[in-house]
Regions:
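Residues that act as N-cap/strand-start positions at coil-to-secondary-structure junctions
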Residues: 134, 143, 180-183, 309, ...
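Extracellular/surface recognition and adhesion modules
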Residues: 116, 123, 130, 137-140, ...
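A generic structural motif
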Residues: 150-153, 202, 331, 466
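Tryptophan-rich substrate-binding surfaces of secreted polymer-degrading and adhesive proteins
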Residues: 1-108, 171-271, 354-358, 417-420, ...
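Glycine-centered loop/turn motifs
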Residues: 26-28, 117-119, 137, 146, ...
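A structural micro-motif recognizing beta-strand termini
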Residues: 85-87, 92-108, 122-133, 143, ...
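Conserved, function-critical positions that sit in or immediately flank catalytic
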Residues: 226, 230-538
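Extracellular interaction modules
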Residues: 154, 161-171, 334-335, 351-352
């Protein structure tokens, strides 16, 4: 028997590798748009609104290639590492960094007060209160067994599966999945786009206080002299970085925000530094030599012992109790530390204080914000501007154009056998036709060559029809179009003679499909820019 865990650092290494090797400069990766037709059965509007599930099979991959419309190369500036966005909000209790806290868990547990009894799939209250704490759909744990709540009121909970054993005087724990955010809210972004990590949340009671003062610094070329800032609500915050304006425009959403280094913060960080000493018990009976309370030198009563060097602190005493510990020098190189209090003038009846040092992560606070904030995601943000020089179709008020599928494709080949490295490519086939007269082909319809769609030598889906040039762009091709043949619209009944065939420059069915996302339809017009964002999380 063994127990193992993949650490968050492996996820971080994965996103770093993905960013470096999937996107420039080591590969040519393209963001593709496709699927002009509706989801589901076109004959049933209700089914057509249900987004299709992605299935990784050979048939589905081939169909994804057939449905492609256009692709645009992902530039180096189109990718960034991101973390879940957390805005500072007054009245919120934020979690503080502690060297013994599992910061990056997505599991939030809330223990209900009081006890309960359980039999089969029914939990009845003993002294617990259910209303306001439990809802249908929540996951709860009782006697080490997890169940989903299917019914609840003030006096009982009904779960989906019977418990193995009856429970008397048990404790109910509600378990919430906070993904993509972490269960511990230990960092914030302020109104100036400055990002801070919480080092102390205002009290040493293990719970903390509500934050009422927004952390902020004025940057004029220098950072604050202290490694952290203190606000009047008792919080201590470590400044990490400011989100650059350009990155905010491209990678900032309601859920995600970019994470970067601040060179000055990195240069000022110290590995194994002690920035915070918490008072778990202030003790009693501590006095100065003259019997008055006040500041006491750490050399006389406080020593920080461990495998690092240089940590020096002072203590403030009020009525014989240690009420505050001030760090004069956080030292460096600590992986463990013990705060020893030795006051020769302590009253014989006094109790020893319990002070606990919090050691910074490897490199120090601010040395690597991506690791410190648990970065496990990379965002791609690509702009499709208008027609991209007559490469990507757009619609009109009369003939709308839309797409429903987004794909990341690495290292596609061109028809001439070399790797694609251009900026934008059309992946549809262009048919030059004779004028269909008063009829017009309609987007999304099937066109065919033959006596009927069922008895045809060629079928394709209309992506876009340009009546001004009599050019028809199609994908999802079956068979080969022949010049001189009659092309018929399956819905419009429009007919034309094929005058020319221009295949796409890109060779379909080449390259690696790394990501497929099916969405609701996105409608394009000539004056529109789509900023398509994809987030890959691990």
């Amino acid at each position: 028997m063994s127990k193992a865990a993949i650490t968050p650092l492996l996820k971080f290494e994965i996103v770093e590798i993905i960013k470096a090797n999937v996107f420039p400069t080591y590969a040519n990766t393209y963001l593709c748009i496709g699927r002009p037709t509706r989801w589901g059965d076109d004959a049933d509007p209700e089914l057509a609104t249900e987004i299709e599930d992605v299935v990784y099979s050979t048939n589905y991959i081939n169909q994804t290639f057939r449905d492609m419309i256009a692709m645009k190369r992902v530039a180096a500036a189109d990718t960034a590492l991101v973390v879940p966005r957390v805005d500072w909000v007054t009245g919120t209790r934020y979690d503080e960094y502690r060297d013994g806290l599992e910061l990056f868990s997505h599991t939030d547990k809330l223990t209900l007060g009081g006890t309960v009894n359980a039999s089969a799939n029914l939990i009845t209250t003993n002294t617990a209160v259910f209303t306001g704490s439990i809802s249908v759909g929540n996951t709860i744990t009782l006697n080490a067994e997890s169940r989903q709540v299917v019914g609840v009121n003030a006096t009982h909970i009904v779960v989906n599966t019977n418990f193995t054993y009856a429970v008397l005087d048990g404790t109910v724990v509600r378990t919430d999945n906070t993904y993509p955010h972490f269960a511990n809210t230990f960092y914030v972004r302020n109104s100036k786009d400055q990002v801070f990590k919480c080092l102390h949340n205002g009290a040493d009671n293990g719970v903390g206080l509500q934050s009422t003062i927004e952390p902020t610094i004025d940057i004029d070329g220098q950072l604050p002299e202290n490694p952290w800032i203190s606000t009047s609500d008792g919080y201590k915050w470590k400044y990490l970085y400011t989100i650059p304006y350009g990155l905010k425009q491209k990678f900032f959403t309601r859920t995600w925000m970019p994470v970067v280094d601040d060179n000055a913060v990195v240069a000022g960080s110290t590995s194994g530094r002690i920035d915070i000493v918490e008072i778990h018990d202030g003790g009693t009976g501590y006095f100065l030599d003259n019997g008055e309370s006040g500041n006491v030198s750490s050399l006389s009563i406080i020593t920080i012992e461990g495998d690092g060097v240089g940590a020096v602190a002072t203590a403030r005493i009020a009525s014989g109790v240690i009420t505050e510990v001030n760090i004069l020098n956080g030292g460096s190189g600590y992986t463990y530390a013990e705060v020893v209090v030795n006051d020769p003038d302590q009253l014989p009846t006094g109790n020893l204080a319990n002070l606990v040092a919090s050691i910074s992560p490897p490199g120090g606070h601010g040395f690597n914000p991506r690791k410190e904030l648990g970065c496990y995601s990379v965002m791609t943000s690509v702009d499709f501007v208008g027609t991209e020089t007559d490469t990507i179709p757009v619609g009109t008020d009369v003939v709308p154009f839309d797409f429903r599928q987004i794909v990341l494709l690495r290292d596609p080949m061109l028809a001439n056998g070399i790797f694609a490295n251009g900026s934008v490519y059309r992946t549809t086939t262009k048919l030059s036709l004779t004028d269909p007269g008063t009829s017009n082909y309609t987007n999304d319809e099937t066109v065919y060559i033959g006596t009927s769609e069922e008895d045809s030598t060629f079928t394709a889906t209309v992506v876009n029809w340009d009546p001004n040039t009599n050019e028809l762009f199609v994908n999802n091709i079956r068979g080969e179009p022949t010049i001189g043949s009659t092309l018929t619209g399956g819905v419009s009944a429009a007919t034309s003679t094929v005058l020319g065939v221009e295949d796409p420059t890109v060779a379909l069915f080449t390259g690696d499909l790394l990501y497929i996302e099916n969405r609701d339809k996105i409608v394009r017009d000539a004056d529109q820019t789509e900023q398509i964002r994809l987030v890959l999380s691990f």
